[in-house]
């Protein structure tokens, strides 16, 4: 009985790892990549975006080594950068601009300061200006506060 459960556990573990690897491969194949600061920024963008895009979180900071690795990894991708409209966000933007000089820089209104704090209709308009597809519900209900 223990051997069967042990085997089933490792089978599920291997399937789970395989699924993660396949999903990572699919994400690596995407042509568009967005770099953001935090997980809540990523979640906000994912809720508005209506097209496949890999979203990379820097967690507010990035080492020079990781930045160079990303530059090598993303050299043939369309890179978008959306960071907070605060001092740390602008510092990160400058760092990213050096490595990704052809990236499309997106900006939230300074009134919101943070990507995660901006309303979805505002994020939708920012993404739309960069020719990214968004869920139209966030454009249609702009006046109703969605």
Curated annotation (Swiss-Prot):
Residues 31-119 form the Toprim domain. GO terms for biological process: rRNA processing. Pfam families: Toprim. One of its GO terms (molecular function) is ribonuclease M5 activity. InterPro entries: TOPRIM_dom, TOPRIM_RNase_M5-like. It comes from the Bacteria. CDD domains: TOPRIM_RNase_M5_like. This is Uncharacterized protein YusF. It comes from Bacillus subtilis (strain 168).
């Amino acid at each position: 009985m223990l051997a069967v459960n042990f085997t089933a556990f490792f089978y599920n573990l291997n399937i789970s790892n395989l699924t993660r690897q396949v999903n990572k491969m699919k994400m690596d194949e995407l042509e568009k990549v967005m770099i953001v600061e935090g997980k809540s920024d990523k979640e906000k963008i994912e809720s508005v975006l209506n097209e496949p895009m890999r979203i990379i979180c820097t967690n507010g900071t990035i080492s020079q080594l990781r930045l160079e690795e990303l530059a090598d990894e993303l050299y043939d991708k369309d890179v978008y950068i959306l960071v907070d409209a605060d001092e740390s966000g602008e510092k990160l933007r400058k760092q990213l601009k050096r490595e990704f000089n052809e990236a499309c820089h997106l900006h939230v209104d300074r009134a919101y300061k943070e990507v995660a704090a901006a309303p979805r209709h505002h994020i939708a308009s920012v993404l739309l200006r960069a020719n990214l597809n968004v869920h139209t519900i966030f454009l249609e209900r702009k006046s109703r506060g969605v």
